[in-house]
Amino acid sequence: MEKPFAITLDPGSSLANHTGSWRTSRPVYLDRLPPCNKQCPAGEDIQGWLFHAESGDYESAWRHLTKDNPFPAIMGRVCYHTCEGACNRGKLDESVGINSVEHFLGDEALKRGWKLTGPTTDSGKHVLVVGAGPSGMSAAYHLRRFGHRVTVHEAGPFLGGMMRFGIPKYRLPRDILEAEMQRVVDLGVKVELNSKVENILETMQAGKFDAAFLAVGAHIGKRAMIPAGDAAKIIDAISLLRSMEGEDKPMLGRRVVVYGGGNTAIDVARTAKRMGAEPLIVYRRTREKMPAHDFEVEDAMQEGIMVKWLSTIKQANESSLTIEKMALDSKGFPQPTGEFETIEADSLVLALGQDVDLGLLEGVPGLQVSDGVVQVAANMMTGHPGIFAGGDMVPAERNVTVGIGHGKQAARHIDAWLRGEEHVPAPQREVATFEHLNTWYYADAPKTVRPVLDVIRRQSTFDEVQGGLDETNALFEARRCLSCGNCFECDNCYGVCPDNAVIKLGPGKRFKFNYDYCKGCGM
């Protein structure tokens, strides 16, 4: 009987056996877009700065972050961190605490006195920015880094815009706000406070500006047609929050009713609680339809704030309100029932939304205004050449993160326009979804939760409610990042390859593959 054919190899080496010939697939580098990056309205490279943070190089992490967003200490406190909702780790155990690490980096930078990187050239161009809120100051920062002279006109007495007048101190301490605003000014940005722009064309001509970015915040509170007696005390939410920045605090009385269901209504109710009042929120829909974020509502309820659902205010008097109860119809819409109730109230605060003062645009040719906002093209330029707009002035979600992103986008387009060019954003890569990941590499690691001030102190002081992580916890949280879609040289492939087909090239150079021996195992 014939023996089967066989190959004998030198027992000292198996190099002659090119196992790569068995391969049906081969490893290649394919960088995908992390879902957190895609979700971030400010356009941060979250995976990029987390990579530096997890190695303990906090300054590099902060500098990588501030290339896109100059306000990490602010954002670590007020951003609604939708990036965490998109985080792939949330399908493995819990999402990475991106916002808490950003909070830590922002505070670390302030503690260590790190400065923002300034311009290296002078373009000779001068850009006007109207409004010193998140969008305006973000644009000023990026424009200055491009080498342009920047002058910011702010109608109010302070920097910060709606971050100061729309966000209470217990969420955003004013020393943090002022420190991060000042860092932008220190780059050479000129700021003119108490300087309201009445006519944009006249101001541009008088200042010989080459372009303008309009970022006026929504500071005008919307009113409701509520019949009221002469002695009824009615105030809009933004006016109330603004008055909290002055020395003379508003006199609301003990029983304060807040009408509305958004985040501003929550902020006003929590502010009133800290002033010693007994706030009650009246909202015409159910909890499920409330536009305020769930965690904000939960925080308010923990502090003892009550909500009267499915109710509308029909009459305001000196010391009482008449409320009509609502009921949901078959389609889920609230309808009046004809059933009324009288509740005691010393003051009524309307938190029904805000509008932007567009008076500075009167007479500007080419501009299109619709539903109280300015229409802009993809490059964020209005219908008038050289005038760009963003933040609350344009059709978009209104929050700090979106405003900061608008400022950055507009600055890039303004810079290109001033150079007679067009800014073309880089093509977006395919998103690295959970299905693309080899999750068996990662052990369970519970999310680190930031400390919170106890409820008793929250009810009676304006101390910051949410604390920050210490270095140990921030480092742990950064290391929970899966680095979705990008090689970060974790060495797992190098360690598990039985054929030594993965070859290290050194820090930052990734790896190369010996295809003679790689069997394409997919590890």
Enumerate the language-model features and the residues they cover.
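N-terminal Rossmann-like FAD-binding beta1-loop-alpha1 element of flavoenzymes
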Residues: K125-T151, T264-K273
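Mid-to-C-terminal Rossmann-like scaffold of FAD/NAD(P)H-dependent oxidoreductases
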Residues: A6-T8, G12-V28, D299-Q302, S311-K314, ...
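Iron-sulfur cluster-binding cysteine motifs and their immediate structural context
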Residues: P34-S55, G76-L105, T151, F158, ...
